[in-house]
Amino acid sequence: MCGIFCSVVNNVPLNSFNISSALKVILKNRGPDVQDEVVIDYCFGKILFAGFVLWQQGESVQKQPVVEDDFIFLFNGDIYNTSKPEYMSDTTWIAERLAECRCKEQNILKILKRLEGPHCLIIYDKREQILYFSRDALGRNSLLIERICNGFQLLSTSHFEDKKISLELPPLGLFRVKLNDLNSCVLYPWQPLNNYSTQLLRNLDLAIGWKTAVESPMSPDWMLNCNPAFSYNFYEFQYIKNNVNLYKNLIDQSEIKYTLSILHTLLSDSIKNRVRNMAPFCRLCMQKLNISPPCRHAKLCILFSGGLDCTILALLANQFVPVNEPIELINVAFESVKGQNISEKLFDVPDRKTSLVSVNELKQLCPERCWNLLKVNVTRLELQQHLTSRIKHLIYPLDTVLDESLGCAFWFASHCTHSTARVALIGSGADELFGGYTRYRNSYSRCLGNDLERQLAVQNELERDWQRISARNLARDDRIIADTGKTARSPFIEENFVKFIRSLEVYQKCCFGFPEGVGDKLLLRLYGYQIGLRDVVFLKKRAIQFGSRIANKKQNGSHQSDNL
């Protein structure tokens, strides 16, 4: 993961054009291995480019920004569908493609259409004085845009200041700004805009003070419709009352078995790419310049509540990590009561108990692996101190109670002092794809229509959440986890996996005719059962903010936080 920064300002003296010390610290936390800055002139002012790199790919670290004769390039992310050699980083590979096409606009669009993986990028065409910038269509990596005096700036993460206009750049496509006219912008969207994305674009225009013209969609290949046309319906099996018999019966159904085989192939490939594409050193050995690979310390961790999603990720990741390397399972718990005497019992929260059960399952299934369960205990005093001094800046510009709870939980988990990992797998997206949240069950039960109308109510809720997943979760989580020198990777949010799961009917993914812990995320629970998990596949969904005891259920998560 990297920190990237680009500031465009009209009429500014060179000696007053720099990154604030507070912001530089935050960006360097994202990319501690190498940093560089470049300032250039354009027709009406100056542009500052800065890159802060966390080395994860290639034989050696690639300094940013990349400066060529025709362009300047900043990149943050991972690309998984290129044919680049192992010694080359994604940044270098894309820069070479840009150099080959001399940064021509139509060729830039062709390159972007091909990319699969979480990323955001900034390209400056020196000859035409045009700035291009984008986030991937799923919005997995953070890129903020801020209005500043006489210009604007793009940055991976920011520093909270009152009265500053800042928002997450919506992941709608490739934006183009000609620097001789900062009042207008052009968008090449990934796909045709709907009501939600149109509103995001209006919000952007209003905040930054320009008007965006929308061109024809780029339409990446992975976005094309997928219609597997399966006919199975989980609701037809409600007569089976025993949960174990239900799962065995469903797995034996030919169409369901075939669906699970596709799910397995796609999810395994996603995890393999995210586990194998990392630097050969752990966090500690990276600091020792004279050490030779291979380092045998843990390089991979999983943010581990012990729930279904993260346990599946752990079990599959086991296939792709050398057997003599540990895998870290990081579990976070917050002090459940206030008091001066800190004891282990104060951290005996639901997710801690679940993690102990699930790690035992992993040890039974994979006894040759060293599973390091790292327990992170956070007192209320520590929580308040770090929230005020550091975490609130990473959550910014989001500001709700839910943002605070989730942001703090992920920050303390990924900041575990005993962790040597530089890549963190997280289960983001599973609930939105498979129907895991309680509100989906509520949509079904509260609908007074027929079964078709009930299914439509659930589908509408799923679609609404999927459209908002980047703005609600992904970009914030990227900022939070990257602050600890780790790269967050979300195997469930992979282009082809997402395309396949979203092509299934809602009754082929979940069934609210069955009780909690059985029918919600039913397809994923079946998959977990198929690969050998038992106890965890029948656990009820529990949000991390409640399982870790950081949040109070009486609070409304959508309300603005007093601490942000």
Swiss-Prot record:
Gene3D superfamilies: Glutamine Phosphoribosylpyrophosphate, subunit 1, domain 1, HUPs. Residues 2-180 form the Glutamine amidotransferase type-2 domain. Keywords: Amino-acid biosynthesis, Asparagine biosynthesis, Glutamine amidotransferase. Residues 280-541 form the Asparagine synthetase domain. GO terms for biological process: asparagine biosynthetic process. GO terms for molecular function: asparagine synthase (glutamine-hydrolyzing) activity. This is Asparagine synthetase domain-containing protein CG17486. SUPFAM superfamilies: Adenine nucleotide alpha hydrolases-like, N-terminal nucleophile aminohydrolases (Ntn hydrolases). It comes from Drosophila melanogaster. The active site is at C2 (nucleophile). It comes from the Eukaryota.
